[in-house]
């Protein structure tokens, strides 16, 4: 279950669809993009991801993948199911080229890797996809008998067509010779200019003449130029021949239609099978578009597990990444973990600190993953499968139902509590907001308690202290903070799991220049204990960030030392192998020299 109906618009997946459509080669792939759907079947999701991963390798490692002629001829094929209908010349040309593309793709995917065991494929998932696809070599051969390499009907497509075109060529030649003779005489008499040549008007060969001299040439006036300075005369001597040309052209058209109709009649029983092959072409176009998009966003397949899990390292919101890249900026990556011990993450921190972006990143990437798209994160990341995803973000105000923002929020909570389970992922922004804080916080805590009891997974953003305390006191729920630099007074857009975040309300108020006496009054109203607790919280987060940085530095140094030690050990092993090899070869050479010396001594003794 995906909730609400406009879930894709809320997380930005509609924009992902549009970006994918732009990478398709044809309407075949574009339809697949629009039909792309979320799946909660582990095997299906893994197969889709593996297909895209393999195609990324094709894009990176191969330069001969057949991707030239992705034509959607399905409407034409469906049209000729009706008796008497036929494919025209262009449709037949598109059919041939796209059938050749299907054939070439199947051959490409079914090839074996010479470096591996016999029959093994470098692209096993795509090979399975191409396994039962019919490639219609006889159909292609028939079309080749009709069309030239450039898509024109061949002269020898039929005996009758060859005869018609021979007569056409002969008649045209005769007319041309007659016209040239008439033209030379007219030029010698000064009726037409020296540089004038015969031209075509309404399919008939004519001579351009000045209006004042048109009576000098006996014939039929067919047309005049837009300026009125030229008329086009068909000499009487070639009228009959031109009429014959028109007759032959009609015969040619009728014979071509007969040839195309005959071919379409032969094709008609196989149309259903041919259409199945075009479904394969559509799938390849779709997978290729997903692979191109994966390259654009540095997407990959994390280690996929058949359970509910988020263990992401350096995850990135792809739309934000593309947007910032245009301005030469980079996204701050997200590290997040949800598992059986910490299923629900409560994120707190200052406004505009990245809480909502964090929540949307989780929703978008998980939805992309289960829709068969590779996602941008570190390769050591792990991901699971959820049966349903719910989101509550933004203003869902309905004029028709006269619902306020908070009423809409509560309606969403009601649906989530009713429908969620241990395989669900819930995403809630500003949990409990939109009403009086005390009761809003209480209701939010009660709802959170139900979510936890149902063992659902989720990411929730909030400012409420009671929800932070709930996370500290209950198993399955964990706090997270969006980090903030107190000295620079700016958000760092980094998520740190383990401690709640501060809203930094006092610091932000002081930064924007609120009078100190107002800040002092506010501090007195809320109480020194709250202010001190918030400061202690900030100190804890700051210290944790400091020690986390130290830990990262130590880890990097340890990794560097391990790599150095491993490199030296490898070099020592290589030296030992080289030493043994040198000694072995030296021993063999000594033995060979001894054998040769003994042989020479024996030969010398025999000769004496």
Where are these regions (language model features)?
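Extended, Lys/Arg-enriched charged tracts that mediate electrostatic binding to polyanionic substrates
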Residues: 162-213
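SMC-family hinge/dimerization module
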Residues: 196, 201-232, 242, 304-333
């Amino acid at each position: 279950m995906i909730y609400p109906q406009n879930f894709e618009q809320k997380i930005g997946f509609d924009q992902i669809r549009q970006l994918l459509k732009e990478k398709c080669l044809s309407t075949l792939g574009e339809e697949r993009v629009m039909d792309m759907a979320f799946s909660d079947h582990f095997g299906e999701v893994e197969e889709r991801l593996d297909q895209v991963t393999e195609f990324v390798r094709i894009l990176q490692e191969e330069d001969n993948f057949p991707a030239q002629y992705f034509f959607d001829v399905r409407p034409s094929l469906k049209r000729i199911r009706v008796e008497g209908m036929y494919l025209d010349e262009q449709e037949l040309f598109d059919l041939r080229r796209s059938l050749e593309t299907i054939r070439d793709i199947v051959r490409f995917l079914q090839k074996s890797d010479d470096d591996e065991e016999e029959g093994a494929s470098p692209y096993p998932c795509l090979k399975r996809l191409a396994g039962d696809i019919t490639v219609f070599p006889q159909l292609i051969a028939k079309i080749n008998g009709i069309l030239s390499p450039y898509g024109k009907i061949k002269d020898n497509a039929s005996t009758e067509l060859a005869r018609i075109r021979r007569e056409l060529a002969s008649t045209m030649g005769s007319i041309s010779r007659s016209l040239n003779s008439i033209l030379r005489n007219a030029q010698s008499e000064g009726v037409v200019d020296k540089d004038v040549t015969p031209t075509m008007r309404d399919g008939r060969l004519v001579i351009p003449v000045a209006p004042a001299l048109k009576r000098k040439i006996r014939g039929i006036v067919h047309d005049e130029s837009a300026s009125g300075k030229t008329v086009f005369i068909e000499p009487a001597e070639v009228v009959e021949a031109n009429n014959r040309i028109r007759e032959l052209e009609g015969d040619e058209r009728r014979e071509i239609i007969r040839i195309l109709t005959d071919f379409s009649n032969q094709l008609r029983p196989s149309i259903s099978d041919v259409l199945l092959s075009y479904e394969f072409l559509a799938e390849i176009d779709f997978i290729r578009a997903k692979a191109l998009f994966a390259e654009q966003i540095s997407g990959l397949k994390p280690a996929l597990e058949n359970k509910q899990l988020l263990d992401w390292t350096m995850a990135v919101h792809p739309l934000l990444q593309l947007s910032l890249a245009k301005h030469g900026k980079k996204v701050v990556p997200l590290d997040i973990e949800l598992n059986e011990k910490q299923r629900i993450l409560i994120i707190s921190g200052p406004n505009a600190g990245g809480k909502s972006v964090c929540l949307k990143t989780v929703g978008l990437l998980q939805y992309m993953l289960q829709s068969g798209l590779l996602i941008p994160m570190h390769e050591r990341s792990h991901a699971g499968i959820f049966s349903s995803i719910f989101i509550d973000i933004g203003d869902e105000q309905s004029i028709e139902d006269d619902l306020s923002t908070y009423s809409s929020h509560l309606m969403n909570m009601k649906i989530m509590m009713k429908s969620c389970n241990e395989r669900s992922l819930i995403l809630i922004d500003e949990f409990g907001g939109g009403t009086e804080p005390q009761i809003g916080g209480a209701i939010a805590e009660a709802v959170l308690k139900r979510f936890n009891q149902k063992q659902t997974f989720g990411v929730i953003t909030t400012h409420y202290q009671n929800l932070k305390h709930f996370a500290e006191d209950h198993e399955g729920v964990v706090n997270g903070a969006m980090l903030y630099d107190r000295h620079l007074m700016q958000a760092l857009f980094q998520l740190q799991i383990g401690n709640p975040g501060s809203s930094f309300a006092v610091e932000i108020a002081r930064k924007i220049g609120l009078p100190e006496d107002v800040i002092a009054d506010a501090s007195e109203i809320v109480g020194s204990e709250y202010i001190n607790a918030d400061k202690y919280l900030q100190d804890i987060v700051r210290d944790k960030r400091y020690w986390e940085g130290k830990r990262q530095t130590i880890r990097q140094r340890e990794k560097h030392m391990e790599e150095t030690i491993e490199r030296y050990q490898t070099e020592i092993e290589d030296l030992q192998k080289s030493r043994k090899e040198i000694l072995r070869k030296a021993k063999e050479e000594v033995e060979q020299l001894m054998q040769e010396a003994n042989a020479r001594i024996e030969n010398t003794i025999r000769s004496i």
